[in-house]
Regions:
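Short, conserved micro-motifs composed of acidic
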Residues: 2-35
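Acidic, serine/threonine/proline-rich low-complexity intrinsically disordered regions
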Residues: 100-112
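Family-specific functional microsites
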Residues: 205, 210-322
Length: 322
């Protein structure tokens, strides 16, 4: 028997002439239609735009990201792989029922609303400055863009309904399709170009079997950190020039590849024998980072930025020296 007191109605129509609200009678109860209602956890609106669903999950996910962020300081705290697993909770909230409403992600304003929440989580995973672009921080942290994840899940669901082979094969195929779409977006993007020079192939970077990003390595990969060119852009330094190379902008590229102040460290890194199984990897300024160099690269970047920070603080009169 229908419980009329608990009954809700939403009229699915795009016709402007249709009366809104619409009233109907069930038994002895008059029921007025609503603009949207929640059914099995998905908010359905009368025009099937799923705007209310996206606003709802974005708000809930933002709260989750904010709470988890308290566990993830820039220095210390969980490793990036653990951070990624924790932030997966926010993805689960956002992507619930995406097989039904996934087409709404093709609307740019809806995509941006969810991407904004995901970006905040990716910043915590990579321990990055908040000025790092969405494209760059997602690559550095290894987090697939939320709209591509949503479309992937919808394609998998459609393939299962069509009986297109074993689920494992379908998932593998669609994951490769997502990597291809992400790679195309990465290659044609306008932001994160320094990161693109270092991490050209997303699939290789995300699926690497060694190396964790942290506060120090992320500064190198993003180009946002203890570099005078960046600090000058943020209004912290009076000029963008290197302390040790007059007239040369102190960018991440200059610090890690050219600055004579760090030539001894660069040479020591190249000759280091402590990690022989990783020796075949290298970092190239235009050719990208070999995944096999991640362990060496993390050590190299941490030493470089720790020393750089000490020197910068000393120059600012805070009492830090080498």
């Amino acid at each position: 028997m229908l419980a009329t007191a608990k009954t809700e109605v939403v009229v699915l129509t795009a016709q402007k002439w249709f009366p809104n609200p619409f009233q109907t009678q069930v038994v002895d109860q008059h029921i007025e239609s609503r603009r949207a209602l929640k059914y099995l956890g998905v908010t359905i609106d009368s025009k099937l735009t799923f705007r209310d669903q996206i606003v709802s999950v974005a708000t809930r996910a933002a709260t989750t990201v904010a709470n988890l962020s308290r566990l993830m300081p820039n220095v210390g705290g969980p490793r990036s792989s653990c951070r990624r697993a924790l932030m997966g909770v926010a993805n689960s909230i956002v992507l619930y029922g995406v097989e039904i409403w996934g087409e709404a992600l093709k609307v740019e304003k809806y995509r941006k609303q969810l991407a904004s929440v995901q970006r905040r989580g990716a910043l915590r995973i990579a321990c990055a400055y908040r000025t790092v672009s969405e494209a760059a921080v997602l690559v550095i942290s290894g987090v697939t863009p939320i709209d591509l994840l949503g479309h992937e899940r919808k394609r998998i669901w459609d393939a299962r309904r069509a009986g297109e082979g074993p689920l494992k094969d379908v998932r593998t195929r669609e994951r490769e399709e997502t990597f291809a779409l992400w790679q195309e977006r990465w290659e044609t993007g306008e932001t994160g170009r320094w990161t693109y020079r270092l991490i050209g192939q997303i699939r290789d970077w995300v699926l690497r079997d060694c190396g964790e990003v942290d506060y120090y390595l992320t500064q190198f990969l993003a180009g946002h950190g203890q570099f005078n060119a960046y600090l000058h852009r943020m209004g912290i330094r009076n000029d963008p020039y290197c302390f040790y190379c007059p007239g040369v902008a102190d960018s991440a590229e200059h610090t890690f590849f050219d600055c004579q102040r760090w030539s001894e460290i660069r040479l020591r890194w190249r000759e280091e024998k402590e990690v022989p199984q990783r020796r075949s990897g290298e970092i190239r300024r235009n050719g990208g980072i070999s995944c096999r160099s991640s362990v060496e690269g993390a050590w190299y970047c941490e030493v470089m930025l720790t020393r750089s920070r000490s020197i910068i603080r000393y120059k600012r009169g805070e009492g830090f020296s080498e």
